[in-house]
Every structure is written in C-alpha cells, then in structure tokens.
C-alpha cells in the first residue's frame, strides 16, 4: 500500500523519480506511518513541492526485501528511507553495509538523544540512523491492588528485585494475585534485567556468553525465584499476557513504554494505574533501574538519489524539532526519545488514565539513564535460549544443564 503526503506523486516503485520526493518504507498506519506523514507535512511548509511517498511495509518485509536486494547485488529496489527495529538493525548493517548511507555529515546534535538509543544505529562511532520512538522500560502497577495488600507506588520505586520479591510474595498471600506477568519463551523480562546492568548474553566479541557470565546467572537465579515464589506468573503467549493484566490477575507489568497503549484501552481501569522505575538487580555494581525494550529508527539507504535532502528532512523533524514531537504525540501516540521534547508543555500534561501522572516527560527522562551494553545480531535467538532455560529449570532441570544447553544452542544458532 502506498500513500503520498504533502504532494501528489504516485508511487510505482521504490524510486519516485522526483528529486523533491522521498520514498519511505514503514509499518503501522496509526503510529509510524502517521508520524512520517506529519513529518512530511511539517517539512513541506518551508520546502515548497516536497513530499514523502510512504509504502506500507511490515517490519518483516522490510528485512526480507533488504536481504533479497543484497543477495541480488541490486539495491535499486530500496526506498530512500527505511524504518527498522532497533534490536534487528545491527544484524543487517553488519551483513549488508553497502545498503545504508552513513550520517557523518548530518546536522544533528546527537547528545540530544540517550546514549543507548544512539548506539543501536551506530558502528565504529559512526551514526547510520535517526532515532525515532522511545523504548524506555517502565513498571506499571495497579494501585488499587497494591493498596489492598498495604503498599503504595513509593514502595515499588527505585527498589531492587529482592525487595520486589518480598513485596510480591506478601501481595500474593494477601490477594492471590501476582505482582508481575511474563511470557514464558517469548517474554523480555530477563533481557530487560540484563540490559539494566549494561550486560548481555554475548561477550564483547559477540560470542555466546551464558555459562560463566556472573550477571547472567544472577538474573536467571532471580527470575527463577520470582516464578517459583508466585511473584511472576509465566504465561504461554501474548494474548494470555495481556489477559492477566487487563483481567486483574497481575498487579504489575514491566515492559517497554509502548505497553501504555494496551493499558489505556481498558477504560474501566482509568486512574488505577501508575508508572515508575523497574527494579534493579541486587549485588551488581553496574545495575540500574533503567532498561530499553523496543523502538525503531530511520535509515537512509544507498539507493537514495538525494541524500542531502533526506538528511535535512530527517534532521529538521525527527532529529531536532520539539514542535514536531509535540504534534505527533496526541495523534500517533509516538513518544519521543529526543530528550528536549520531554521538557515541553505537551509532554508534561497530566494523564488522567495514569492518575494525573505526567508519564510522557517521565518516560523521556528514563531514556536518558539507560546503560549501554554489547549488542548482538542474535538478540531474539538469545532471548529464546535463556527463556527456554528458565522454563526448564522451573520444571526441574538442573540449572547447570539448562544453562549449558542454552549456551550451546545459542552458539549453534550463531553459525546458521
């Protein structure tokens, strides 16, 4: 599906054939595409004749088409600009470096973005992407359930996971509810724990690093204990995950801030939810109460015929405009990772659903504290391996055996 904005050009291929039009691949009509549409409209106000032609392309299709073009040695099918998920981009940049244009000459103050967000789209200190949506992790709690057990949001702010477990066990005994829910093999809780310590399940050389990784073992031990002590409810899939939250079976959720859209769809729970920081891992010097889960960035491909225009467009909108981020927030729900945006009046408006909290400015502020960590092109493979290990340990497998299997499986997947 193609959509032309701020102009009348019609997309017939990835090449618009118009020096003043940029083609874009992106997904999600109401979020990413709407934001790009509004960016095009804003830029066109000062650049007569400018337009963006947006071709709706799923995230998977963006990756598949990029791979197909690279394998054919022909990048002419690529658009000028493509949206890519932060957790997958490194894999494609390292595999197909000729597919992208570096942003060495772009006029952007990169310090206006959190260091972790920048690092997703960097290689060897060179920027390749303009950060877009914010993936900062938040902890959300049903304050009515907390109060039923005798707790407030302050009791769960800036705490450790051991304190979280203490509260969670008490809450379960008093209410029968869980303090947290997580998907068994597809969940991100363990990955967020690791990232909050500035760590990962790979070493600096990109090799599988689970066995012998002290931080990994601490996180896995914590996570297993949380499950075994009825603090975390493991569920089988996303639908069950959402059902435990909206149905009131779990009093809390730790995830990327995009989860707020799901919570806000439950109108009958308006005013009952509030957000705060996630717990941090005990006895790890680098541990913090901040992590990232999700997010994406915009990239200029090597097929772009007018790189100067593409750079100026992205720099003038996504790269520097608080007015732009103020405009898209109420329309698309896209929360900025551009730090100055968090200081605006729009971002500081109280949110009724979250009991009057100014959640958007808070989320932007959280994103500035997230530690950097070693990236891997095999993020999702690592997630599957360690989550499977946790399930196996909970079901009775010896921890050493489960972790060794996870290590071996991840190492094998890295060779495929």
Regions found by a protein language model. Give the residues of each.
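Short, low-complexity disordered leader/linker segments with a strong preference
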Residues: 1-23, 45, 404, 408-416
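Glycine-centered hinge/linker elements that transmit conformational signals in sensory
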Residues: 166-170, 206-235, 278
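Extracytoplasmic "Venus flytrap"/periplasmic binding protein-like
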Residues: 42, 46-115, 148-150, 251-252, ...
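Short, well-ordered beta-strand elements
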Residues: 18-29, 50-55, 80-81, 128, ...
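Conserved C-terminal helix/tail region of periplasmic/extracytoplasmic solute-binding proteins
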Residues: 147, 153, 344-349, 361-416
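Hinge/lid segment of periplasmic solute-binding proteins
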Residues: 83-138, 162-167, 192, 197, ...
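C-terminal lobe and pocket-closing loops
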Residues: 90, 259-270, 282-385
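Extracytoplasmic/periplasmic solute-binding protein
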Residues: 126-132, 137, 147, 162-209, ...
């Amino acid at each position: 599906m193609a959509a032309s904005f701020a102009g009348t050009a019609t997309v017939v291929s990835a090449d618009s054939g118009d020096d003043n039009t940029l083609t874009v691949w992106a997904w999600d009509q109401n979020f990413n595409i709407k934001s790009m549409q509004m960016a095009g409209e804003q830029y066109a106000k000062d650049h007569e004749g400018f337009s963006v032609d947006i071709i709706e392309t799923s995230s998977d299709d963006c990756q598949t088409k990029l791979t197909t073009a690279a394998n054919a040695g022909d990048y002419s099918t690529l658009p000028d600009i493509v949206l890519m998920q932060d957790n997958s981009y490194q894999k494609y940049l390292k595999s197909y470096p000729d597919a992208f244009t570096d942003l060495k000459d772009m006029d952007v103050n990169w310090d206006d973005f959190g260091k972790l967000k920048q690092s997703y789209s960097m290689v060897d200190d060179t920027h390749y992407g303009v950060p877009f949506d914010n993936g900062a992790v938040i902890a959300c709690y049903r304050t009515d359930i907390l109060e039923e057990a005798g707790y407030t949001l302050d009791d769960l702010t800036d705490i450790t996971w051991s304190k979280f477990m203490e509260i969670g066990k008490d809450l379960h005994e008093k209410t029968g509810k869980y303090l947290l829910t997580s998907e068994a093999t597809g969940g991100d809780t363990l990955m967020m724990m690791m990232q909050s310590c500035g760590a990962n399940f790979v070493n600096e050389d990109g090799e599988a690093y689970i066995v012998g990784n002290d931080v990994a073992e601490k996180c896995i031990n914590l996570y297993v204990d949380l499950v075994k002590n009825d603090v975390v409810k493991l569920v089988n899939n996303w639908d069950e995950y959402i059902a435990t939250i909206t149905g009131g079976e779990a009093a809390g959720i730790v995830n990327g801030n995009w989860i707020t859209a799901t919570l806000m769809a439950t109108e009958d729970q308006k005013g009952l939810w509030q957000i705060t920081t996630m717990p941090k891992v005990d006895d790890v010097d680098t541990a913090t109460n901040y992590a990232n889960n999700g997010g994406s960035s915009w990239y200029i491909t090597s097929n772009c015929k007018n790189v100067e225009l593409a750079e100026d467009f992205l720099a003038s909108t996504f790269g520097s405009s608080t007015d732009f981020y103020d405009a898209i927030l109420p329309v698309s729900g896209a929360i900025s990772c551009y730090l100055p945006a968090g200081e605006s009046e729009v971002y500081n408006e109280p949110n009724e659903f979250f009991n009057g909290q100014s959640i958007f400015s808070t989320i932007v502020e959280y994103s500035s504290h997230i530690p950097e960590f070693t990236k891997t092109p095999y993020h999702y493979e690592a997630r599957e391996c360690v989550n499977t290990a946790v399930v196996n340990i909970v079901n009775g497998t010896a921890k050493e055996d489960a972790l060794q299997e996870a290590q071996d499986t991840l190492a094998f997947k890295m060779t495929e």
